[in-house]
Structures are given as structure tokens and as C-alpha cells.
């Protein structure tokens, strides 16, 4: 995924009200960015970090600029725009970069499914195999050299796990895909210490057939690309 038009950078002053952040440019201009991330963003929004942002030409937008990347003072790159994860995973599948998800002839996004009024992020289909339902999650929380999900209690995430299990029970394939969008993360685990119910439920549905796939990414102001498969651990 290439950023076009190119991103620009500024220094983070503060993030607030979840969806907003104030920054200051190298020229001394201050303004407010939109932040498309509902999570806690722990370690991703420290005042003084470098923020890379995109700019929309839509005149109806209240905030023209969107926070895309953080370059931390420790040197890590993080994609904080969670809307990018689905695009990254779809591109990687279409380019046959994810071995676990190859061999399908059709890919669709945001398809309604399940008994709890959900929409699956990606649906893979082929004539010679069962449908594959993929729920994509962005991982950015780094603690003690390990990436954790979620970074806040997520009832919606728990619902998605139940829906994925129902897919498996219907004889189809269900995949929970962790897109690791933090350059410092080398392995992933469920965050028992943040959302114990989610972590317990994830362990249960994995044992019952929901697949878990984790891939890291190369991140820069030029673009983001999924690359290496990363290990997933249930402690």
C-alpha cells in the first residue's frame, strides 16, 4: 500500500477525545488531526513522537488531515490508522503473499454474516473449497518484546470470535488475522491482563477450529506492506 499523495510529518502535542490529536509542524504551525483509532493506543501517542499524516481534498471534512503513522522517540514505526489493516491484508492475499490464504478465486469485503448482525472483513470463495471468513485485527500494543491484542476491553471483538466459531460449526473456514503494524513486535499473544474474557474466548475458539494467522509489516512514510509471518502464543 503506497501513500498517495505523500504523507507529511509533525510533532505530537497530545491526543484527546479518542479521535483527535493536536500537532505542531517543523514550521511552527499547530492544527488538529483526525485519529481513526478507537483503542487505547498505549505507546503509540506519546507527546513528542513524530506523526505522519495524510491530507484529504474533501472540502466537507471537518478535519482535513488524518494520522497515519507514529515514529516513536525509541525509533519504532507504528500504523495507528486501523482502517488500513483490511486494505493491507486484502492486497497481500491478492498478491499471493499469504500462503495460508492462497487458492481462492474471489475476494469480497464487508459481507453480512452471522446471527449477531456482523460484517466479515474479508470473504474468500472458490468453487472447489469451502468459503473462508477472515476477521482482521490491527496489533500495535508492545509490552516486554511481545505484541498484545486487544489494547482495551472489546465487546465487539468478543462478538466477532463467537461469529467466527459459528462459521466453523457450519462447515466453513474461519480465520482471525492479526496484522502487526508495529515494527518492534516479533510475536503476538492475547492480552489476558487487559481483556481476560476475550483472551479466554480466543483460546476456546482456536481449539474448536478458528485459525489464527499473524503477519508483520514493513512500515515507512512511503507505504506499508505485509511481510513476515509471526508466531502466536496462548499462554
From Swiss-Prot:
A Pfam match: SfsA
Coiled coil start-end: none
InterPro entries referenced in this protein's UniProt entry, alphabetically: SfsA, SfsA_C, SfsA_N
UniProt-recorded Gene Ontology molecular function terms: DNA binding
Entry-linked CDD domains: SfsA-like_bacterial (cd22359)
NCBIfam families the record matches: sfsA
Family of the protein in this entry: Belongs to the SfsA family.
PANTHER family: SUGAR FERMENTATION STIMULATION PROTEIN A (PTHR30545:SF2)
Protein name from the UniProt record: Sugar fermentation stimulation protein homolog
Gene coding for it: sfsA
Amino acid at each position: 500500500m503506497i501513500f498517495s499523495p505523500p504523507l507529511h510529518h509533525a510533532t505530537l502535542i497530545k491526543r484527546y477525545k479518542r479521535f483527535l490529536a493536536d500537532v505542531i509542524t517543523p514550521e511552527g504551525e499547530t492544527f488538529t488531526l483526525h485519529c481513526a483509532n478507537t483503542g487505547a493506543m498505549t505507546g503509540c501517542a506519546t507527546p513528542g513522537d513524530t506523526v505522519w499524516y495524510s491530507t484529504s481534498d474533501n472540502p466537507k471534512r471537518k478535519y482535513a488531515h488524518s494520522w497515519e503513522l507514529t515514529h516513536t522517540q525509541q525509533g519504532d514505526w507504528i500504523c495507528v490508522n486501523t482502517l488500513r489493516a483490511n486494505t493491507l491484508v486484502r492486497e497481500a492475499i491478492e498478491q499471493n503473499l499469504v500462503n495460508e490464504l492462497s487458492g481462492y478465486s474471489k475476494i469480497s469485503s464487508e459481507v453480512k454474516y452471522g446471527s449477531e448482525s456482523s460484517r466479515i472483513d474479508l470473504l474468500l470463495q472458490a468453487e472447489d473449497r469451502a468459503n473462508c471468513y477472515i476477521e482482521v485485527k490491527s496489533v500495535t500494543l508492545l509490552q516486554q518484546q511481545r505484541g498484545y491484542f486487544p489494547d482495551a476491553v472489546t465487546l465487539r471483538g468478543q462478538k466477532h470470535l463467537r461469529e467466527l466459531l459459528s462459521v466453523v460449526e457450519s462447515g466453513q473456514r474461519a480465520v482471525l488475522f492479526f496484522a502487526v503494524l508495529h515494527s518492534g513486535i516479533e510475536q503476538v499473544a492475547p492480552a489476558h491482563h487487559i481483556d481476560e474474557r476475550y483472551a479466554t474466548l480466543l483460546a476456546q475458539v482456536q481449539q474448536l477450529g478458528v485459525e489464527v494467522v499473524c503477519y508483520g509489516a514493513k512500515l515507512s512514510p512511503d507505504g506499508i506492506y505485509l511481510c513476515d509471518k509471526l508466531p502466536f502464543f496462548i499462554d
